[in-house]
Amino acid sequence: MFTRVRFVFLGVALLCSLSVFAQTLSGVVTDQKSREGLISATVQLIAGDGKINYTSTDLKGMFQFKKLPAGTYTLQISYVGYKTYKEAVVIPSSGEKKVNVTMREDVNLLDEVSVNARATRAEQKGDSLLYNAEAFKVMQGSSAEDLLAKMPGIVVEGGSIQAQGEEVKKVLVDGKEFFDGDVNLAIKNLPSDIIAGIEVFDKKSEQAEFTGFDDGEEVKTINIVTKGGFRQGTFGEVSAGYGTEDRYKVNGNVNFFNEDRRISLLGMSNNVNQQNFSQEDLAGVISSGASGKRRGGGRNGGRGGAFGGNASDFMVGSTGGVTSSNGLGINYVDQWGEKWKVTGSYFFNQSDNLTQQQTEREYFDSSLPGMTYSEYQESSMKNWNHRFNVKLDYQISNRTSLQFRPTLSFQNNDSHGLLQGLNLLNGMSDNETETATLGENDAYNVGADLILRHRFLKEGRTLSLMLSGKMSNTDGNTYTDYLNTLYSADGLSETDSYSQWKQTLNRQYTLRSNLSYTERLTDYMQLQLGYKLSYTDSENDRKTYKKSAVSDLYDQLDESLSNEYQSGYLTQAGSVGLRYRAGKFNAMLGVDAQWADLRGDMVYPQADNLSHRYFSILPSFTMRYSLDRTNSLQLRYRSKSSAPSVTSLQNVIDNSNPLFLSAGNPDLDQQLSHTANLRYLRTTKSGHTFIAMVGATIQQDYVADSTFVAKEDMELTPSVTLSKGAQFTRPVNMDGYYSLQSMLTYGFPIDFIRSNINLSLSANYANVPTIFDGIESKTRELNLIPKIIIGSNISNNLDFTASYSAGINKMFSSLDTATGSDYVTHTASAKLGWTFFWGLTFRSTFDYIGYTGLDTGTEDYFLWNLSLGKKFLKNNAAEIRVEAFDVLKQNQAFTHSIGSNYYDYINSNVLKPYAMISFVYTIR
């Protein structure tokens, strides 16, 4: 009896002691004026013995500390641009302690240049890196893009943004989507003076954010954290200008923010190559073939051609040449009651582009001795695009939620193209082609994602289901007139002319699902079990008709250039994952056992089918270790499979350029890729920021180009002849592809000139396998890019930035050992903005681009733009500016690239010099 009583007392004592260490402190941090939650605020809980617990607030401003012993603590909360909050809190021996904190803006902090300001230049908060916008001063009236360009580890160049060595795919505003995350719409239209901080992180998918397990779908994301005073009110900017050469530009953006409800209106129209949005232009991507773009045909990395890119990546930047753009959009964010959250946007844009491009190609002597290629291309392209996006979140209960995200877009593309290509052998004409093309494409994309999420009563146990469906359709018509000339050794020539109509219909359906179950195993470990299914069905129907000399109609079907092909790719995977999280260490290990079925069916001109089945083990691993508040290390590894596109599988000849024919390959296999990267971050209280990143990618069964050159005229089909000197390319699977990437960035302030300096060095290496004339080769490219940026941090009235980078390019092929493959790209820039007495403003941008080490000698140009303005009205809300573009009249667009057996030198048309007077009004 005594023994039993003793055990009872021991058990009660043990339970009591455990309860002492099982208390929870939670709360919400909000802005005093707007009452909105502050995202990524730093929360410290300091015990009586000095031990400090850290966390940060989530997207709702909430925080939580678990398993705390009872006692008295000091709660300290800091946030960029706000006064630090400090309070003594008592954790009871039982129950949960809740604290609601409101924070006030620190108006004095915004004008201080001190050690304290430097201390918040950049901070690590969990998996995020948060920059203090007040530590990077830009001129009043600047955009978010100007602010980002001054921050270490962020590169703004060529209409895209890179952060920590990766391209930024999404931009949020206070954790909320802004025009479906369109990068350019956010950074080019939002003013810099509303920004309190910039948060850089890898955004996981909605399902992964819920479960805590990565699914490989994370994208580099920037979250623009606005100042509390701008979360309720109206702000924006409108401007209009007209100048010489009939140049004009009109821009406007107005934002109505009222706590949870946010409405943004955008509009723009100009003919000066300004495109303040990303263009979702599937029709433009697919129609690029109408203007002469082709596999192996000549402008890899070229600037200013037709729309480039992958047809699965609809968001593309502005084109080369000269572009007129019009756009109009609305973004809506709101919370309907306590259960509904809605985000929606509509955007329309129209663009008209004229590109004139000259390409000069030199082949390696070992592959095509004495052979050169010259091409002139002119294309006129008009695009219309409508896109709708909605995101609905419904909180069914406190443990169950539903998210529905439908999308819809329409595109139309009209193009006119002229292409003149000439092959020369030892300086003498060998063969040439001239094509005139008229094309029209219509496309639509519709899709929807549905996510059901449930948290069970047991902590760590969740169940979630994701369902996704997408459908795309493109209908195109292309009319082409051909004139081909073949020269003989004795100087005689033979010409052939014909016309054809190409009708294409491309459809694709994609269905995906992901069922995930998580279970807490211990206080530090969680298990995930999942099942994934994905199916993509693609169809490409291409019919080519010749023009009859008798009827003058396109009524003669060319079977050798016609094909109907269907492909299907089904993957099923069972997945298991383990997540371990204890203090500063967080790791996740996962593995997918995937079964895949790749099917190809040729329907026309004759029936044929192929089927490939695969089994793959696809592991993944993520590890993050926070050495302390200022140092962190992250390691990530991913593996995945991908199927070849239907156009790569379709064995039909593309004769857009008769000198460079191409066709698909139905025998292609799926690709497997393995990607790993290691990243180290260090931020100090003295304002120093250091980022180091190294990564590698290996691809198995890489889809490479296999090209051969006709030594004599070759008949490929009864109606298609590969003329002497012309090339034929088709895709093949090859092993041996790998790439290496690395980046170092070091940023620090210099007080005596009140500026920030960012030093960076990136190094990239790629090994690309190819086949040329039956010989396997490797094309290797090494790029080293050192860069220095000096940005002022004086005041909003004086802003300057100076930068220089040297792109050291060493490219060589196993087909050629000749010199001339090394060149250096020099890029320098100086930017000055100054508001001086009587509200006068002066702005100047000076850019230099030069190439050295080329066979053509040194090529370079300067681009200098100036403006002088006068601010007036209350708070200097209005400004009149006189602007001059290309003062030195040197603007050019040229670039250089390398292929498996050639070098390209490319020049494009550019915007000519003009002067403009404009009016700008700031809404506050």
Residue ranges and their predicted role:
Residues 21-114, 122-124, 150, 155, ...:
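Periplasm-facing N-terminal accessory domains of Gram-negative outer-membrane beta-barrel systems
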Residues 62, 66, 76, 83, ...:
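Membrane-proximal, glycine/serine-rich, low-complexity loop/turn segments characteristic
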Residues 211-212, 277-282, 355-371, 415-429, ...:
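Outer-membrane beta-barrel translocator domains and adjoining extracellular loop/strand segments
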Residues 233-243, 265-267, 594-595, 664, ...:
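Transmembrane beta-strand segments that form the barrel wall of outer-membrane beta-barrel proteins
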Residues 239, 315-318, 371-378, 430-438, ...:
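Extracellular loop and loop/strand-boundary signature of outer-membrane beta-barrel proteins
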Residues 376, 510-512, 556-563, 669, ...:
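Outer membrane beta-barrel strand-and-loop segments of large Gram-negative receptors
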Residues 526-630, 818-820:
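Signature of Gram-negative outer-membrane beta-barrel scaffolds
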Residues 787-808, 820-924:
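Conserved C-terminal beta-signal and adjacent last beta-strands/turns
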